[in-house]
């Protein structure tokens, strides 16, 4: 009898399956918190692999960008066509503190505004806020009929388009330079800038559907934990002067 490996004996029994491990047992959930500039601060939840060895869960979470509908953050369906991007900057226990990272329109809203018999005017500026955030802001506007107009269309001449684009760029630059990122976010939500553009351009050509359709973050300053805590309503001036609990007073021996 030849001495060798018996292939039949080395095989496992038929029907046995490998033990399936649920991948979610190695993950943990974190709550995403929006800045205090929004009405609803509870954005949702996200998961990440648990900390093991040299791999820390907080390192995998920092820098993560989530996209949320502005209607969910404000509790109003009037903002359902705008999407807000929030970036995770700090991990505090099971809470993820985020900051504004950008804004955009939904595709269906942009497509619905483009119609016949009117002129589309677009403008964009790259400008720095007062707290050193570099943003690129895109604005969009459409012409409308003048009062008592008989013509069917409301096309604007090239000179009108250039003049309107110049006014829009000047207003956007001024508003961004004189505001912090949090203040600018507060202006974008109620569309304060849009009304200012409409009033400034009514003598050139009447406009409608004026929107800041996109805000893109190009560069951000060095991370400041104190500024982020203030943005989330923590570490404010009301708490100044309070005694910090959890520490014992150290008694020094007299010399």
Swiss-Prot record:
Modified residues (Phosphothreonine): 254
One of the GO biological process terms: translation
Compartment(s) of residence: Cytoplasm
Alphabetical list of InterPro entries matching this protein: Ribosomal_eS1 (IPR001593), Ribosomal_eS1_CS (IPR018281), Ribosomal_eS1_euk (IPR027500)
Linked residues for Glycyl lysine isopeptide (Lys-Gly) (interchain with G-Cter in ubiquitin): 248
Superkingdom of origin organism: Eukaryota
Keywords: Acetylation, Cytoplasm, Isopeptide bond, Phosphoprotein, Ribonucleoprotein, Ribosomal protein, Ubl conjugation
Modified residues (N-acetylalanine): 2
Signal peptide span: none
GO molecular function: structural constituent of ribosome
UniProt GO cellular component terms: cytosolic small ribosomal subunit
Chain positions with Phosphoserine modification: 245
Pfam families documented for this protein: Ribosomal_S3Ae (PF01015)
Similarity-based family: Belongs to the eukaryotic ribosomal protein eS1 family.
Quaternary structure, from the entry: Component of the small ribosomal subunit. Mature ribosomes consist of a small (40S) and a large (60S) subunit. The 40S subunit contains about 33 different proteins and 1 molecule of RNA (18S). The 60S subunit contains about 49 different proteins and 3 molecules of RNA (25S, 5.8S and 5S).
HAMAP family in alphabetical order: Ribosomal_eS1_euk
Name of the protein this chain belongs to: Small ribosomal subunit protein eS1B
């Amino acid at each position: 009898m030849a001495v060798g490996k018996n292939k039949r004996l080395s095989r496992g029994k038929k029907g046995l399956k490998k033990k399936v491990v649920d991948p979610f047992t190695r993950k943990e959930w974190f709550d995403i918190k929006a800045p205090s500039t929004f009405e609803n601060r509870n954005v949702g939840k996200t998961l990440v692999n648990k900390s093991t060895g040299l791999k820390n869960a907080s390192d995998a979470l920092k820098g993560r960008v989530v996209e949320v509908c502005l209607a969910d953050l404000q509790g109003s369906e009037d903002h359902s066509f705008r999407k807000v991007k929030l970036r995770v900057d700090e991990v505090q226990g099971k809470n993820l503190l985020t900051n504004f990272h950008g804004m955009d329109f939904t595709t269906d809203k942009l497509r619905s505004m483009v119609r016949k018999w009117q002129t589309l005017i677009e403008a964009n500026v790259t400008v720095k806020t007062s707290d050193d955030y570099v943003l690129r802001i895109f604005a969009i506007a459409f012409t409308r009929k003048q009062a008592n107009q008989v013509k069917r269309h409301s096309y604007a001449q090239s000179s009108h388009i250039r003049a309107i684009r110049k006014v829009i760029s000047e207003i956007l630059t001024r508003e961004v330079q004189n505001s912090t990122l949090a203040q600018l976010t507060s202006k974008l939500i109620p569309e304060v800038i849009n009304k200012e553009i409409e009033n400034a351009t009514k003598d050139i050509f009447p406009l409608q559907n004026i929107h800041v359709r996109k805000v893109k973050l190009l560069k951000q300053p060095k991370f400041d934990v104190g500024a982020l805590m203030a943005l989330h309503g923590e570490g404010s001036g009301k708490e100044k002067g309070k005694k910090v609990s959890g520490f014992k007073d150290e008694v020094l021996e007299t010399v």
